[in-house]
Amino acid sequence: MAVIKMTDLDLKGKRVLIREDLNVPLKEGKVADDTRIRASLPTIRHALESGARVMLLSHLGRPKEGEPDPAASLRPVAEHLATLLGQEVPLAEDWLDGVEVAEGQAVLCENVRFNVGEKANDEALAKRMAALCDVYVMDAFGTAHRAQASTHGVGQYAPVACAGPLLAAELEALGKALEAPARPMTAIVGGSKVSTKLDVLETLSEKVDQLIVGGGIANTFIAAAGHPVGKSLYEADLVDKARQLMDTARANGGEIPVPTDVVVGREFSADTQAVVKRVDEVDDEDMIFDIGPETAQRYAGMMREAGTIVWNGPVGVFEFDQFGEGTRKLGEAIAESDGFSIAGGGDTVAAVEKYGLADRISYISTGGGAFLEFLEGKTLPAVAMLEARASD
């Protein structure tokens, strides 16, 4: 993708406004999980070491615009960031009128969502943000699918708008996986409902060699193949759609395989007994919570042979260990594969962490909704803006 990269610019002495995704969970006023903060560090360090005057933007939570809420303040993030960087990172509360920052220093601007007009991509607000800087850096892939003042509007009016290293790496990895994938290409799409992932399923069914479905989504496909699903979560009104998707995959030389065995339980709880059954032996009281060992082995074989793997969603209720074997086996097969693998989505990343796979997956996306929209083939507003500015 043709965008200007921050790493190609001379930043010395420049006022550099960087939009990161520092929307992290807090517990008792402290950062509970700093994964997103750590992901942003290479970008921030590069700007500081280049002698830039760095201003950082992010949202946190969902406060009501125009009503600053102490519970959504970025102060704990500023304190945590200061520790990681080994230098002071002041929090600027009233930053829209200007920020005092020296070369090689960073200031974190208070929650962008405290400003009226942020979510609506208000032009006047975007222009005030743009007036703060010489260079605007969009580095928050996780919010690239939202056209908001701090992710889109500001970039339209800043003197220079570019992609930060984290965003550039995301686009490169996703481009490699989707635009010219090494074959065979395999995708895993898990989740509770077909309806929430319908666009992804439709797009991928035309592209991939194998589209493996998991979770509640798989139950709808199991029903579409004519098997009983008992009391399992599934969408009866989308059974015909599931059949269509299977036909589409076949017409494009691919397949959406259906499990031959499953793991069932009688209730959704951590201590319910797990029972392996053939897919045609599920009874009226059963709930399907995972793929069975035979199916897991078959799918794992596909992973090991794949040239490209896209993973979005677990294949079972992996939060309960007795229903996590399918996800674990597929995750380990992806980690062992010589193919290029990309994983994204909150539950997927949680599974990657649980089974200790992080350093063996080629790329782990920081985006949830943005990752999904990219898989759907949609244009991300922030990326479209950067492309337009690159051709100014």
Curated annotation (Swiss-Prot):
InterPro entries: Phosphoglycerate_kinase, Phosphoglycerate_kinase_CS, Phosphoglycerate_kinase_N, Phosphoglycerate_kinase_sf. Substrate binds at D21, L22, N23, R36, H59, L60, G61, R62, R113, R146. The keyword Disulfide bond does not apply. Its EC number is 2.7.2.3. It is found in: Cytoplasm. ATP binds at K197, E319, G345, G346, D347, T348. One of its GO terms (cellular component) is cytosol. It catalyses: (2R)-3-phosphoglycerate + ATP = (2R)-3-phospho-glyceroyl phosphate + ADP. Its main location: cytoplasm. Keywords: ATP-binding, Cytoplasm, Glycolysis, Kinase, Nucleotide-binding, Transferase. Pathway: Carbohydrate degradation; glycolysis; pyruvate from D-glyceraldehyde 3-phosphate: step 2/5. PROSITE patterns: PGLYCERATE_KINASE (PS00111). GO terms for biological process: gluconeogenesis; glycolytic process. GO terms for molecular function: ADP binding; ATP binding; phosphoglycerate kinase activity. Belongs to the phosphoglycerate kinase family. PANTHER family: PHOSPHOGLYCERATE KINASE (PTHR11406), PHOSPHOGLYCERATE KINASE 1, CHLOROPLASTIC-RELATED (PTHR11406:SF23). Monomer. This is Phosphoglycerate kinase. It comes from Alkalilimnicola ehrlichii (strain ATCC BAA-1101 / DSM 17681 / MLHE-1). The lineage of its organism: Bacteria, Pseudomonadati, Pseudomonadota, Gammaproteobacteria, Chromatiales.
